[in-house]
Amino acid sequence: MKYIGAHVSAAGGLDQVIFRSKELGATAFSFFLSNPLRWNLIQFRDETIKKFIFLCKKFNYVSDQILPHSSYLINLGHPSDEHLKKSRLLFVNEIINCKKLNLSLLNFHPGSHLRKISEQHCLIRVADSINFALQNTVGVKLVIENTAGQGSNIGYCFEHLAQIIHKVKEKDRIGICLDTCHLHASGYDLKTELGCRQTFKAFNDIVGLHYLSGMHINDSKTKRNSRIDRHHNLGQGYIGKSSIRWIIRNINFKLFPMILETTNNKLWKDEINWINSL
């Protein structure tokens, strides 16, 4: 069995996330805990929480299969102390909501220096923000997503991820989500089997495969090392199905959520079926 699904819409309520995932035949799913483009601190009603937990049990989804995504507005490395505090508070709010929903993972983007501080300074601020969040919450693993290196985003290389983890105090509550499109766009070679082997060997050597807690399985509309984050459906971009096949067969050595964020959601069911056939 594989934990494979998609990032589905929560429009209409959190319960719809589960229904939509079940309709896809998914054994994993991702969703936004709240509107990803608003700063609102969300407090779920008790009935919403109870219904979500009930439906997860009814349809046999456990927390290891669910990889919720944090708000796009959160920047844990923000150069402004005022905006950094705002990001930290929203991040903690999302972690608390994960715990209330019986979820054990939260996927997030590390942050951006906005060309106002150095990458190293930004990495330190991200690690400090993670430590702040861990100190003020319990029970949820924080899963850092690698980035494409677009704009001033950090986290586009394994060295960045390793530096952040090195400064995190509760290492049992930190993990990594590798996005295949982001790997490709940031310069890692996923086009050939040899390239895939070398890329994941480098990840193991620099970060450690034991930190891998999820993956986003996407093709890319842009060429390798473009530093442009544009997802594509599997086999329709510059990565190709053969590389995705190798990753699915060789990297998912332990069960963790593999989430599609491909552009045409009408193809999700077929993509899930294809991955499950491997």
Swiss-Prot record:
Binding residues for Zn(2+) 2: E145, D179, H216, E261
CDD domains, A to Z: AP2Ec
Reactions catalysed according to its record: Endonucleolytic cleavage to 5'-phosphooligonucleotide end-products
Keyword Kinase: no
Cofactor note: Binds 3 Zn(2+) ions.
GO molecular function: deoxyribonuclease IV (phage-T4-induced) activity; DNA binding; DNA-(apurinic or apyrimidinic site) endonuclease activity; phosphoric diester hydrolase activity; zinc ion binding
Entry cofactors: Zn(2+)
Keywords noted in UniProt: DNA damage, DNA repair, Endonuclease, Hydrolase, Metal-binding, Nuclease, Zinc
Top-level taxon of origin: Bacteria
GO BP term, example: base-excision repair
Residues involved in Zn(2+) 3 binding: H182, D229, H231
Any Pfam family hit: AP_endonuc_2
Keyword Secreted appears in the UniProt entry: no
Enzyme class: hydrolase
EC number: 3.1.21.2
Binding site for Zn(2+) 1: H69, H109, E145
Entries under NCBIfam families matching the protein: nfo, PRK01060.1-4
Family note: Belongs to the AP endonuclease 2 family.
PANTHER family, per the entry: APURINIC-APYRIMIDINIC ENDONUCLEASE (PTHR21445:SF0), ENDONUCLEASE IV ENDODEOXYRIBONUCLEASE IV (PTHR21445)
General function of this protein: Endonuclease IV plays a role in DNA repair. It cleaves phosphodiester bonds at apurinic or apyrimidinic (AP) sites, generating a 3'-hydroxyl group and a 5'-terminal sugar phosphate.
Protein name: Probable endonuclease 4
Species annotation: Buchnera aphidicola subsp. Baizongia pistaciae (strain Bp)
